[in-house]
């Protein structure tokens, strides 16, 4: 019974760390990556679709994304969608290739982004702690209903605490890597 609670808690904690990684990946650094354009949508035959469905998105170099539409007539629409995306990007069409250079981040902007990243990491840690609280509440309920002994309850809570420490450390590691990435010039 305690093992089921631990497995459930570990799965939820792992998911919290995954969500944190996904959220931090959306924060733009000075380095180019194709995932940056994932949320940019362009109109295609009357419906809005992600850029990746109407164009080939590649890295030209560490600071430039290349976007090559599958159909030549889509280049202007794709360029406009990227420009209007609120990502602070300024694409330039060169023939049928759209070059998207990554602007340099100012020191002030880097510090603002670090604050955002730290906030996201704290949300991840809170989520992990909430999973711990739920698991401990479940263990206490089993103890109250006399389904487990006090020793089993204590061991269960200690195991859940170890899981919590492990996943909070992992969240901190993810945060440190992102901060380092942001501060790299």
From Swiss-Prot:
Question: What is the protein's known function?
Answer: Responsible for the release of ribosomes from messenger RNA at the termination of protein biosynthesis. May increase the efficiency of translation by recycling ribosomes from one round of translation to another.
- Alphabetized HAMAP family for the sequence: RRF (MF_00040)
Q: Which GO terms describe its molecular function?
A: ribosomal large subunit binding
Q: What is this protein called?
A: Ribosome-recycling factor
Q: Tell me the Gene Ontology biological-process terms attached to this UniProt entry.
A: cytoplasmic translational termination
**Which gene carries the instructions for this protein?**
frr
Q: What is its main location?
A: cytoplasm
- State where the protein is found: Cytoplasm
Return the InterPro entries for the record: Ribosome_recyc_fac, Ribosome_recyc_fac_dom, RRF_sf
PANTHER family per UniProt: MITOCHONDRIAL RIBOSOME RECYCLING FACTOR PSEUDO 1, RIBOSOME RECYCLING FACTOR
Alphabetically sorted, this entry's keywords are: Cytoplasm, Protein biosynthesis
A cellular component term from Gene Ontology for this protein is: cytosol
What family does the database annotate?
Answer: Belongs to the RRF family.
């Amino acid at each position: 019974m305690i093992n089921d609670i631990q497995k459930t808690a570990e799965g939820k904690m792992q998911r919290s760390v995954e969500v944190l990684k996904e959220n931090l990946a959306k924060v733009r650094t000075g380095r180019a990556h194709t995932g940056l354009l994932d949320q940019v949508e362009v109109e295609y035959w009357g419906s809005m679709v992600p850029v990746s469905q109407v164009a080939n998105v590649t890295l030209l170099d560490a600071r430039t994304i290349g976007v090559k539409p599958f159909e030549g007539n889509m280049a202007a629409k794709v360029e406009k969608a990227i420009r209007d995306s609120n990502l602070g990007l300024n694409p330039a069409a060169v023939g049928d290739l759209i070059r998207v250079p990554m602007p340099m981040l100012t020191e002030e902007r880097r510090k603002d982004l670090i604050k955002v990243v730290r906030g996201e990491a704290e949300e991840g840690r809170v989520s992990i702690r909430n999973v711990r609280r739920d698991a401990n509440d479940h263990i206490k309920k089993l103890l109250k209903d006399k389904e487990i002994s006090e020793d089993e309850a204590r061991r269960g809570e200690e195991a859940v605490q170890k899981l919590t420490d492990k996943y909070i450390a992992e969240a901190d590691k993810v945060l440190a890597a992102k901060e380092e990435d942001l501060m790299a010039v």
